[in-house]
Amino acid sequence: MPVSDAILTQILAQLDAMQVSQQTIQAKLDSLTGATTPLEPKPRSVSVSSEPSTPPDTQVGIVKASLVSAALRVEVPTPRTTAAAEKEREKLLYPGRVNLTTYPDQFGINPYPLKWGAGDPKTRGPVICSRLPSSIKQRNAIGAHSGSYSIYRALSIAMGSLSPTHKPDYSQTEPPVSIPPQASWADPTKIVSFDPYGHLVPTIYHKEIEEGLDIRPSIAVTKAHMKMSELDDAVRKGEIVVDGKVVLKSRPLRNVDGSESSAFSGVEVNISKAAVEPVWYLPGVAERFGISESLLRRALFEDTGGMYPELITRPDIKVFLPPIGNLTVYIFGNPAFMSDESKELTLRVHDECNGSDVFGSDICTCKPYLTYAIEECIRGAQKGGVGVVVYFRKEGRALGEVTKYLVYNLRKRGGDSADKYFKSTELIAGVKDMRFQALMPDVLHWLGIKKIDNMVSMSDMKYDAIVKSGIPILRRYDLPDHLIPPDSRVEIDAKIAAGYFSSGKQITEADLVKTVGRTWEETEH
């Protein structure tokens, strides 16, 4: 009976994986014992007695002593032998020649079919970006999983800490709450910035994974408790109530002596959350930004230092995993209510600000707005609705933290008036904002959101992007004045004058000159 090509391919893939695994083990061994070139046989300097009269415990002691003695006699490697060993180790990890890029008509290249926007995940096909021997010929995506963290994976493999052929065990990782398929998942224009099936990969493509294809989840869904000191304060003030369902009492605190404290232990919030990695469908991303796909590919290639040549040489591959930060969805209340239009939905779309969100900087309103939105989401969930906070990793308006701090320096040395707020950023970055909210609504369509009752945001860009995507917003409201730190008045006034929503007094360009932030001299002690 003839053996089918599929079986032969599977056997070959398994042999390739075994070879790489064996090479990795050998590389680890060489790194531990490599005082000499790995090609040289190591002299046996340890002799272990095996006399029948020697008890087992004694034999173990002899072995340990002999190994310690041998370790002390190991010669210090010279730069030449170390370099040779490292070179040999590199060959063991990567035995083939370096493949800088591939081409559509190259021999053996056969990408796994991928039809973006297909209603059935099997018809759509898995996203495969792996360069492992078992998957490289069937790659249908450019880039690597984990975004910017893919660099740490590469370091871990190079140092021998991680086997490149490690096969994850997904048996207990399925989502504890359901994010079910929506009609938008089958619309190639609604979701173009991540894989809507990313959290279902281990289930949908179990057979393909077992056959050797390196297919990985790009979304993870879990449940957790959220604990913030600001929420404790809100409970003390009576602004949030402990209902035992959404808001729970924290366990009692402990005194220094270990006894139970009678002090207020605070509260915690019952939430569901999802981490979503970027997976770009290039034709859809290009269309969303109003540019050609070829221009998008060229810009991504050139302005990442030429990191991804296949953006140019593989026009047949339409999916790209960019090395950028992910987003996180925080859900307050029943996740099933997100797609139920009869339920009231409160939303905050928040772009990362590490200085304020985590470390409490008062130069901007980011943390107060985030905290206020979380409280609003909790109140909405307790009234029978659902709250959603989407946290995007777009530090410093996607300009980065270094650029942001340089702008801070310019602002403080220049008087820090609101009329110069955006100009200060443009002088350094060349643009006032690079967040480009066109891709942001994708996650709302993934969650099944069809209307937003309460939008806790003043951003005109976020509002316009969401409404343009087909989701109506019934109410928007701004941050209450009493929550705005004095030094962040510069930011908020400049944004209102530039078009941000405000239910209060409108601010003119003439008013901006009068809004001035704190100077450095005022903070010196």
Where are these regions (language model features)?
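Catalytic domains of riboflavin
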Residues: 2-5, 12-14, 30, 42-525
